[in-house]
Amino acid sequence: MLFFRGINSINMDAKGRLAIPKRYRESIAEASENQLVATIDLHSPCLLIYTMDEWEVIERKLMSLPNMDPQARLVQRLLLGHASEMEMDGQGRVLLPSLLREHAKLEKEAILLGQGNKFELWSQEAWDASRPEMLDSASVGDVSESLSSLSL
């Protein structure tokens, strides 16, 4: 399993292509033959980017949700409906569909954030606006039950 970590400032060209940082390219090529999938994030103004093999795991989980449950159908509709396959070219570039670029308000400057099994792709502007609030939220308030046993 691949593990993506770190924060990367990247640029998107006028055609909507962005270059995956070199340190990830070989691993992506080996794990999923240069195939990536991007979809929207349901909670933040960013995109989620998975290797194809990791996305297929997510896709199976989504499809196993009960389709008579309106919330489950909504999540399926949004995540699967916005999922777009992308192929990394020989220069490590991927072409982001315009609908996804518009959703995340992506322009030239962007942030690619490693999140373990996936990347988050943020516009520089949205990242700069959201980061202070995220830092404040992380430093104060109640710790959820799922985080209470985490030791760093």
From Swiss-Prot:
Record key words, sorted: Cytoplasm, DNA-binding, Repeat, Transcription, Transcription regulation
Gene: mraZ
Family: Belongs to the MraZ family.
Keyword Transcription regulation annotated: yes
InterPro entries with a match to the protein in the record: MraZ (IPR003444), MraZ_C (IPR035644), MraZ_dom (IPR020603), MraZ_N (IPR035642), MraZ_sf (IPR038619), SpoVT-AbrB_dom (IPR007159), SpoVT-AbrB_sf (IPR037914)
Stretches assigned to coiled coil: none
PANTHER family xrefs: TRANSCRIPTIONAL REGULATOR MRAZ
Disulfide bond sites: none
Residue stretches making up the SpoVT-AbrB domain: 7-54, 83-126
Name used for this protein in its record: Transcriptional regulator MraZ
Organism: Hydrogenovibrio crunogenus (strain DSM 25203 / XCL-2)
